[in-house]
Swiss-Prot record:
Protein's GO biological process: response to furfural
Family: Belongs to the NAD(P)-dependent epimerase/dehydratase family. Dihydroflavonol-4-reductase subfamily.
Species of the source: Saccharomyces cerevisiae (strain ATCC 204508 / S288c)
InterPro entries registered for this protein in UniProt: Epimerase_deHydtase (IPR001509), NAD(P)-bd_dom_sf (IPR036291), NAD(P)_dehydrat-like (IPR050425)
One Pfam match: Epimerase
Entry-linked CDD domains: AR_SDR_e
Record protein name field: Putative uncharacterized oxidoreductase YDR541C
Keyword Secreted: no
EC number(s) from the headed UniProt entry: 1.1.1.-
Entry GO MF terms: aldehyde dehydrogenase (NADP+) activity; oxidoreductase activity, acting on the CH-OH group of donors, NAD or NADP as acceptor
Keywords: Oxidoreductase
SUPFAM superfamilies attached to this UniProt entry: NAD(P)-binding Rossmann-fold domains
Residues where NADP(+) binds: K38, Y167
Length: 344
């Protein structure tokens, strides 16, 4: 039986870690990327592994975007991991840049599976987000508990006030579309659906060369604090985190384990604040002491009592593995950044 996995958005932060773990477990991987430049870079980075092939999908929101790939390779594919989705806040064209690409990209890949691989694809995993679960307006309410059953309450209209609200909602609409698709087409498809809903992502880039001056949104928080002058004020930011390596493993478990079928896997390992990150940086990296702010050491625990709570105990029970600690995740992220800057 085929052990081939299709991974959309193969050059993404999460997807690269997924590819690495799949190849280590001897899966055959077909990845989609947006350009021949990304294709060449990825093949080089994975040392032209014979189990990795790539296909070009320039725009996932374009009608029938995945038809060519599924028509060509669909008979080989047993599992599909759809990780491709826009992730940026710096836009004012919310429908064009966030809502429509996320929604249409998800619908497109599911329709292509239905057309060309309905008999061969057994499991589909969609990379969603905690933002599909969390309602922004309720994040600061300590009486609110978000779980695997929660949904972001934003509407198509109400979310279009800024990039953050629109991004949060885009993940909700894309995930909803996936669940609705499986329900409406249950007589025409073989696959079972699982979604993986991660929180803010920390952790190292898979390849050191991908550490640039500006990193993906979550890791840029750590990069930013590393480069914050010692006397500068630090924003009182708090949120929930997960390590990218754990998110990648959750994607594998999402199609490997029977008990994940039909589930939303909320992968997060609790709250953190900027003070927690500063404490780790100052404790673990002597070369940063006196160059970055101290803040108020040891007061990070105070964020635990603030704002809403995310209870993912059901997900933890299903997955059955321990998530990496904030300390490990921040340390590994910072160490890679400092190594690239010859400061380690």
């Amino acid at each position: 039986m085929s052990n081939t996995v299709l991974v959309s958005g193969a050059s993404g932060f999460i997807a690269l870690h997924i590819l690495s773990q799949l190849l280590k477990q001897d899966y055959k991987v077909i990845g989609t990327v947006r350009s021949h430049e990304k294709e060449a870079k990825l093949l080089r980075q994975f040392q032209h592994n014979p189990n990795l092939t790539l296909e070009i999908v320039p725009d996932i929101s374009h009608p029938n975007a995945f038809d060519k790939v599924l028509q060509k390779r669909g008979r080989e594919i047993r599992y599909v991991l759809h990780t491709a989705s826009p992730f940026h806040y710096d836009t004012t064209e919310y429908e064009k840049d966030l809502l429509i690409p996320a929604l249409e990209g998800t619908k497109n890949i599911l329709n292509s599976i239905k057309k060309y691989a309905a008999d061969t694809v057994e499991r589909v995993v969609v990379t969603s987000s905690c933002t599909a679960i969390i309602t922004l307006a309720k994040m600061d309410d300590p009486s609110v508990v978000f779980t695997e059953e929660s949904w972001n309450e934003a509407t198509w209209e109400s979310c279009q006030i800024d990039g953050i609200n629109a991004y949060f909602a885009s993940k909700k609409f894309a995930e909803k579309a996936a669940w609705e698709f499986t329900k409406e087409n249950e007589d025409h498809i073989k696959f079972k659906l699982t979604t993986v809903n991660p929180s803010l992502l920390f952790g190292p880039q898979l390849f050191d060369e991908d550490v640039h001056g500006h990193l993906n949104t979550s890791c840029e928080m750590i990069n930013g604090l590393i480069h914050t002058p010692v006397n500068a004020s630090v924003p009182d930011f708090h949120s929930i985190f997960i390590d990218v390596r754990d998110v990648a493993l959750a994607h594998l478990y999402a199609f490997q384990k029977e008990n994940t079928a039909g589930k939303r896997l909320v992968v997060t390992n609790g709250k953190f604040g900027n003070q927690d990150i500063l404490d780790i940086l100052n404790e673990d990296f002597p070369q940063l002491r006196g160059l970055i702010p101290l803040g108020k050491p040891g007061t990070g625990d105070q964020v635990i009592d603030r704002g809403s709570t995310t209870d993912n105990s059901a997900t933890r029970k299903i997955l059955g593995f321990e998530f990496r600690s904030l300390h490990e995740s921040v340390h590994d992220t910072a160490a890679q950044i400092l190594k690239k800057q010859n400061r380690l």
